[in-house]
Every structure is written in structure tokens, then in C-alpha cells.
Amino acid sequence: QPDPALFPSDIADRARARWLEEFADTRMGDVFIWRFFNQIAIRPSVWGEKGDREMVDRTLKEEIPTVLDYLEAEAPTDGFRFGNSLSVADVAIAAFFRNAGWVRFQIDAARWPKTAGWTGRTLASPAFATLAKIEDAVLRVPIAEQRNALKAMGAPISAETYATSAPRRGIMPL
């Protein structure tokens, strides 16, 4: 484990951290990635397809508020979910809001103040801030040029890539 540890030492907190990470991975991934980001950004820019506007509207009106209501009940007033250092739960949850921010989504801080503060503190942490600089620098770089751009920035990259010039669909139905 890194120091400080990403999993709380208390067994009940550790179980809760695992649950929150799983909630982020499954429910938030479905809502924020597949039903929202994919429709607005990926389908048009990668596949040349029109996104499902009805799905986006329904997600914004119904599904995202349900997720945020749940998170508001879990969110700490200050610090992070399990104290003063980041946990796997903080990272897993905040990552989806970084992604959603790329398509101009922001948490309504008046409606979900604790969640807005919590994710804001997490995204401002050194780990996220370092990645954000790299992400922001390559966000608008054509895919074919991203590897060289990352290398020029000193980002850690693999010795070789298996990328191709054309995107390939995965096995999940989108």
C-alpha cells in the first residue's frame, strides 16, 4: 500500500471504502460514462454518430440527481471521506466528475454542497492536479499525435503501443 494508505485501517471504514469504490465503478460509470459522456463526446467525436439527446436529458434530470443525492449523504463536510487523506473512495468518485467536466457538467453546489466540496477537494489534490495538467494538454490533440505529445511532456508511457489509426469497438453494447 502507498503511504498514506488508500484503504482505511478500520475494518468497517475499509468495507465502506470498498463499497463506495464499487458504487463509483458500477453505478456512476453507467450514469456518467455510458449515459452521459459517451452520448455527448464519444459517439460524435470517435464514431461519427449522433448522441442520444433524450438519454442525456433523462440522465441529467433523473439519474445524475439520484447519484448526487446518495453522495450528499456520504460526503464529508471537510477533508476526505475517511479523514484527512485520500482514500480509494475519494479517488473513484471524483474521477467521474473530472470526466463529466470535459462536457461542461458541474455539480450544483447550492443543491449538493457537501458533494461539490468533497469532489472539489479531491480534484485539487496533488495526484489529480498532476494528471489534470497532462490531460488538459492532450485533450484537443489528435489521437495519432497524443503519444508524442505525452512523451514530450515527460509523461510515463509504455515502450510500445498497440494503438491503430482507426478506433475499434469493444464488446460492450453502447
Where do the protein language model's features map onto the residues?
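Extended, well-ordered alpha-helical scaffold segments
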Residues: 59-63, 110-124
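Residue-level signal for nonpolar/aromatic packing positions in well-ordered secondary structure
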Residues: 17, 71, 90, 122-125
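GST superfamily/GST-like fold recognition
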Residues: 81-106, 111, 121-122
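Surface-exposed helix-capping loop/turn segments at secondary-structure junctions
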Residues: 3, 73-85, 126-131
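Active-site rim elements
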Residues: 6, 54-61, 80, 103-109
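Amphipathic alpha-helical packing segments from all-alpha helical-bundle domains
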Residues: 55-74
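GST-like domain detector, emphasizing the conserved glutathione-binding G-site
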Residues: 1-58, 159-174
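Acidic/histidine-enriched, glycine/proline-rich intrinsically disordered or flexible terminal extensions
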Residues: 135-174
